[in-house]
Amino acid sequence: MSGMRCPTCGFKNLLGSDVCDNCGSDLAGHDTPQSPTTFRGQLLGEHLDALGIAAPEIVDAGADVNDAIGRMHDKGIDCVLVTEDGRLVGIFTDRDAVVKVAGKPVAAGPIADLMTRDPVVLRHDETIAVAINKMAVGGFRHIPIVEDGRPTGVVTARDVFRHLVESLG
C-alpha cells in the first residue's frame, strides 16, 4: 500500500489524506507532483540590481523624435527615457516608433508629443518578481528604474529572460 509521508513528522498516511493522522498537520497540496525543472523561483526574491542593468539612454522632452529614433537605432537599444529638468516624464520605445511614427508623415517634432507619459516605474530595491508582475499586468516590456524621480536604469523583459537563463545554468 502506498501512502504519503507527513512533511512535519514523517508519519506515513493514507494517500489522499488532508490531515496527518499522527500530528494533525495540513497535508493538502503536499501530494501534488513537483515540476521536474531545476528552477525553484530563487531569482524572484532577488533585487533588480542582480540583473546588471546598464545606465539608461536619456533624452530631453524637447528632443526631436527623429533624432531619438536615430540614437535608438545607432546604439541598438529599444527605448529612451524622457526627462524634464532631470526628472522622468516619459518613455519612448521601439513599439511607440512603430505604432505612432511608422508610415505616417512625421515632421521633426518634440519626443514629448509621442512618448508614453508618466510610465510605471520601479526602484532598485524592488525584486525581480515585482518587475515581472508589473510587466505582466501592464503589458510592458520596459520599465524605468528611478531614484528620487530621476531615471537610473530600465528593466527589460530581455534582461529578466537573460537572468533566468543564466540562473538555470
Could you say what each language-model-derived stretch is?
Residues 1-169:
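Tandem CBS (Cystathionine beta-synthase) repeat/Bateman regulatory domains
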